[in-house]
Every structure is written in structure tokens, then in C-alpha cells.
A protein has these predicted regions:
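Donor nucleotide-sugar binding/catalytic pocket of nucleotide-sugar-dependent glycosyltransferases
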Residues: 147-196
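Short hydrophobic beta-strand element within catalytic cores of glycosyltransferases
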Residues: 302-306
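Aromatic "clamp/platform" in nucleotide-sugar-dependent glycosyltransferases that forms part
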Residues: 266, 285
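A conserved mid-protein helix/loop that constitutes part of the nucleotide-sugar donor-binding site
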Residues: 14-22, 204, 208-227, 246, ...
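Active-site proximal beta-strand in glycosyltransferases
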Residues: 3, 101-103, 116-136, 147
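Glycosyltransferase donor-sugar binding loop
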Residues: 37-45, 209, 236-248
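N-terminal strand-loop element at the rim of the active site
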Residues: 6-13, 26, 30-77, 177, ...
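Conserved acidic donor-binding segment of nucleotide-sugar-dependent glycosyltransferases
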Residues: 317-319, 323-330, 338-344, 359
């Protein structure tokens, strides 16, 4: 079976690249699939993730990321040029290698992938959720225009998604967000590493993990920790992630919690940091899935999380293996953290249950679901 994955880039540490690289490496190690990978960003630059040498790859060097810093009028012009080049190179490549299955991450190639007559089954796997995908928000434009452009984008997207052989979403919650589609299924992200150790949940330490961006809501977490700090000044919070952390360090100082809160860069031994912690906090405004939540829970660390769209409600069973609170409610987040701080027995019980509950996200189980999907697609090819 010949499978092509459209990855985009592996230049920066992020959830989607981590998940895709782990998935591709698993298939390379455990199957006899012939695997290909399409990249688009900055040929020649080092990757953040290692890829099994069995995987063949090509980098079209389109560099869509260059558009991020351009003004809108230039961005539109150069996007059209880059997209035209991308479509031609993508089409030529698929027509040359003739894969059995092409897996898109529902990025720029979704606009033309269904029109390529290479004979492959087309699968889309989205690493966002509908509520935050293809939103158009420009502060200098009227709200009605932003809504109009977003509506056009979604209409165009749905036309392409309906044509896919399968559309894979990450959560049951997001599954319900796509009522127009009859080709959708749920396959969650997997935990690629399941540790053989557990946290004691006895250290006076909470942890949060994610990029230093608006999405991850660390500004909300710091405000919540100010409330926690007033009751429990002996507890500390450590945040780990990539990106610019200076504004969060400034906010910590403004809130008076900088002595007990540290914003760290991303680390390679994050599981060791989980083990040293007793509470995991997810303060995201939205997620595609929230894999860090499951990873922390696999080490026996109970979580307090916003019930943001989408993922946490699929992972946490409130009051059983973690705590879910109203999305964006800073006081509720602080109360959930304080509840675990003040009840060590409850905290440890939730941690024990957390380890058990996330076993359903083990890599073997999730990749078996992908294998079944690929086999189903090939069976359909045989019958067609």
C-alpha cells in the first residue's frame, strides 16, 4: 500500500507536527506500507522531529509561512502565486508516484486535492475544530464583513470536504459540529509514549504546557494563579512551551506571582516534568484535541481544564479522573486548582483514575483504527 502524507512543515515544535511525525514513524516501523511525505516550507532547514529513513519525502519549498508577515494586499497576491505553483507541483507528484491513499491535513491543498486524477483515495484529517478553523477576524474591518468572509470560506471548505472519501476529526465533540458531512469519522490523537512511572502527586507544583500564544490562554491561567497564590503561597506553577514568553513574564510580575510562576522554554524531557508535578492545568481558549492533557494524565497527574472546544470533554470525566470548568471562567479554574491542592487524597485518586482512562489513547489502539480505515479504503478501490 502506497500512502502520501501532506505534512507542510516540521520546522517548529507544535502539536500537529508532533502527532503527524509520530504517526508516520509508527507506520514505517510496524507496517510494510510505502510511505511518502510532502513538505512545503524552507527546504534545507533542520526539522524539529526525526522521521524514519524508510519514509520518502519531497519539499516543494513553497514557503507559505512567508505570507504571515505581509500586509493583506501583498498576502493575497503572493498567496495566489504560491498556491498556483503548489497545485502544479502537488499534481505532478501524485501523478508520478500514483499513491493508493493521500492524506491531507486540510490545509491549502484541500482546495484542489479532489481534482487530481491520480486514482488515490483522498482522506482529510483536521487538527483544529470547526469553531476556530478558517475564521476571518480583522479588527480594522467591520464585523459584518469578517462574518461574510468566514461564511464564504466555510462554504468553500464544505464543498471540498464532502468530496473526500473520509474526513477524520479528533473528538466526538467536533464530530457534532459537521452535520453537513456524511463521510466523517472520529479517530483521536494517540499518546506515542506511555511512561512506566507515575507522579506521587505530593509535590507542591502545578504544570502547564503549550506554545506561548493567545490560544493557550496562559494570560487566563496567570490571573487564576493569583487567586490560588492568595490561598496557597507555598505552591508554584511551571509553564513550558515554545514561542515568545516575555509578555507572560511581564504579566506575572504585574499580578504579583512571578516569585512562584516560571515560564520555561520547551524541553525534551517533558514527561519528567509531569512526574515532578501534582496538578496539570489546561487553560486553552480552544483546542484541536488537547493531547498534552492526555499525556500528563498518563503519568498519573490529575488535570484541571477549561471545557473549551474541542477535546477536553472527550478526555476528562469530570470529578472522576480530572476537573472540567466553564471555558474562560478564571474563578472556576482557580477553584478547581484549589480543590485539588486542599484535598490530597482526592488529588491522588483522580491521578490514579487518569492513568487508567487515557489508556484508550495508546498508540497501538489508535493506529489500529487508522489501519482499519486504510484497509477499508483499499477494499473500496478493489470493488470500484
Amino acid at each position: 500500500m502506497k500512502i502520501v502524507y501532506v505534512v507542510g512543515g516540521l520546522l517548529a515544535p507544535n502539536g500537529m507536527s508532533s502527532v503527524l511525525s509520530a504517526k508516520i514513524n509508527y507506520l514505517a516501523e510496524h507496517t510494510d506500507y510505502e510511505l511518502y511525505m510532502i513538505l512545503t516550507e524552507k527546504s534545507g532547514h533542520p526539522w524539529c522531529y526525526q522521521i524514519n529513513p524508510k519514509v520518502k519525502w519531497v519539499n516543494f519549498d513553497i514557503n507559505f509561512d512567508e505570507l504571515d508577515t505581509m500586509p493583506l494586499y501583498r498576502k493575497i497576491f503572493f498567496y495566489m502565486l504560491k498556491q498556483r505553483r503548489y497545485k502544479k507541483m502537488f499534481t505532478d507528484y501524485l501523478m508520478e508516484i500514483r499513491p493508493d491513499i493521500t492524506v491531507s491535513t486540510v490545509r491549502r491543498e484541500i482546495n484542489f486535492i479532489n481534482d487530481i486524477p491520480d486514482g488515490s483515495k483522498k482522506i482529510g484529517e483536521i487538527h483544529f475544530n470547526r469553531t476556530n478553523y478558517r475564521e476571518f477576524k480583522k479588527k480594522w474591518l467591520p464585523d459584518f464583513f469578517n462574518r461574510f468572509v468566514t461564511k464564504l470560506w466555510i462554504h468553500s471548505l464544505l464543498k471540498q470536504l464532502k468530496r473526500l472519501d473520509r474526513f477524520v476529526v479528533l473528538s466526538e465533540e467536533d464530530y457534532k459540529n459537521w452535520p453537513e458531512l456524511n463521510n466523517k469519522i472520529v479517530i483521536p490523537n494517540s499518546i506515542s509514549y506511555y511512561p512506566d512511572f507515575q507522579s506521587t502527586c505530593e509535590n507542591k507544583r502545578a504544570i502547564a504546557v503549550g506554545r506561548y500564544t493567545y490560544q493557550k490562554g496562559f494570560d487566563l491561567l496567570l490571573q487564576a494563579w493569583r487567586i490560588v497564590f492568595e490561598k496557597h503561597p507555598d505552591w508554584r506553577l511551571d509553564i513550558y512551551g515554545s514561542g515568545e514568553r516575555e509578555e507572560y513574564e511581564r504579566l506575572g510580575k504585574e499580578l504579583g506571582v512571578s516569585e512562584v510562576v516560571t515560564c520555561h522554554p520547551a524541553v525534551s524531557d517533558i514527561y519528567e516534568k509531569y512526574r515532578e508535578s501534582s496538578i496539570f492545568v489546561l487553560s486553552s481558549r480552544y483546542e484541536g484535541f488537547g493531547l498534552v492533557l492526555a499525556e500528563a494524565m498518563s503519568t498519573g497527574v490529575p488535570a484541571v481544564s477549561f471545557a473549551c472546544p474541542c477535546g477536553p470533554s472527550d478526555i476528562i470525566h469530570d470529578g472522576i479522573d480530572g476537573i472540567l470548568v466553564e471555558n474562560g471562567n478564571i474563578q472556576a479554574l482557580a477553584d478547581g486548582i484549589c480543590l485539588l491542592i486542599e484535598n490530597e487524597t482526592f488529588r491522588k485518586r483522580l491521578g490514579e483514575e487518569a492513568t487508567k482512562s487515557v489508556s484508550c489513547f495508546s498508540q497501538d489502539l489508535i493506529m489500529n483504527q487508522w489501519g482499519n480505515l486504510f484497509n477499508l479504503m483499499m477494499k473500496k478501490n478493489t470493488l470500484s
